[in-house]
Amino acid sequence: MTGYVRNMSFVKPSELEVLATIHSSMGRRILGIGSLYVLSLSVIYVAISQPPALGWQLFLLVLGGVSIWISEKMRRATGNVLELNHLELRDTSGVVIARIEDMVSVDRGAFAFKPSNGFLIRLRAGAERTWQPGMWWRFGTCVGVGGMTPGPQTKFMAETILAMITKRDLDLLKDD
């Protein structure tokens, strides 16, 4: 038998098969990251070339530095790919975003608090707060997926997760 041991239980290789992926859109990636870098450098340039009062100069330098940090974080985050298998949603850096067994619902509605071109997953219990700009975020029991991602890929993944949740819940009803 082949497989992987995970949480002291046997996992079949078929459960690790990738069902859907989300890649960041290159055009959005260039535009978003490029805009942030231009903003960062512009703010720092203004602070150095035409120094206002010392307090404002420090504020502009800090703002420029934070913008550069966010730009770099976004560049690294959008370099990853999100993968969905039968057990979990994860990114290619190895971070498990959410396990299928912990998911309660998926919301893609127009009025959902979700990223652009994305969807919102509600979890049974809260998890560690984290943010990967342009790809996904997690606050408490909510996971937002999307941002610099193509709409068709996120729609397919959202529908796949919804089908998996529905199947799981129906199987639980059958067992009762």
Report each predicted region and the residues it spans.
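Hydrophobic alpha-helical transmembrane segments of multipass integral membrane proteins
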Residues: 36-41, 61-68
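A broad, low-specificity signal marking well-ordered, structured residues that form hydrophobic/aromatic
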Residues: 82, 119, 143
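N-terminal membrane-targeting/pre-transmembrane regions
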Residues: 1-50, 142, 176
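A membrane-cytosol interface segment of integral membrane proteins
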Residues: 125-176
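Conserved beta-hairpin
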Residues: 63-107
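Acidic, Ser/Thr-rich low-complexity segments on the non-lumenal side of membrane proteins
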Residues: 96-126
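Hydrophobic alpha-helical transmembrane segments
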Residues: 50-63
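Short secondary-structure boundary/capping segments
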Residues: 74, 81, 111-113, 134-137
